[in-house]
Amino acid sequence: MFQILKADKLIDFMRWSKFAFVLSILMIGASIFTLSTKWLNWGLDFTGGTLIEVGFEQPADLEEIRTALEAKGFGDATVQNFGSARDVMVRLRPRDGVAGEALGNQILSAIKDGTGESVEMRRIEFVGPNVGDELTEAGGLAIIVSLICILIYVSVRFEWRLAAGAVLALAHDVIITLGVFSLMQIEVDLTIVAALLTVVGYSLNDTIVVFDRIRENFRKMRKGEPAEIMNSSITQTLSRTLITSGTTLFVVIALFTQGGAMIDGFATALLLGITVGTYSSIYVASALALKLGITKEHLMPPQVEKEGAEFDEMP
């Protein structure tokens, strides 16, 4: 199998665990501060609003359309291509006292006046604020339920100290990703929720691989110290982690650079989540389990007494 590191090389990861804890606490603190002051830039899926799709005869100039809408008082409109270069989607936040159909006609007139081109209305949709509130609750609930299920699974599959490390690592990844979204005011829609759930699953998969090797080495290296076994396990799985994360990031970077405005947020969430998740599987999940005092006794299979063993010991 292809290896980035030599099989006999041992990296002392736990030596830097205190520094990593401080770094993680600072990043989480900064993310919570940003979220508490700026919160998130919710998209129409959550706030409600109007979505209008129009068609041009020639490839549309998005900057010209934005300028035309801004001149008519629609400076908050989000303009992007949808499908082909001739199809344009305009998204607007709710406006008091203006019906969805009337707003669509105003947008269409503004685009025609500003660009001087023939424009056809393709579709108009209105998302009410009540639907947005329901989606917000459902999205948050989906992430919370997934973390609870992961806690139960890892506790049964491994041990509660490892489960605590895994769940806190996942929460760490989600909070930092949301913190960056809050800082940069990237619009959060349903695709971002999907990306966060993808990050949770991806990060967990990486953590489970490391945990499986930790459990195996605790049973094999009976005389080794816990920190030594952790270092050995992470080093042994590091090539797999780097290769998997690297190839995934190549695809995500392609989406980020070539995917267009429609999936910018999705690709950004994956890019951040996978990068932070690779770090957290080593320095949050594993290091936290070590701090909680995990030993080989916690991972050894229970001894089952054979029936009649007490009679075998009798003289």
Residue ranges and their predicted role:
Residues M1-P315:
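A structural signal for conserved, well-ordered secondary-structure elements
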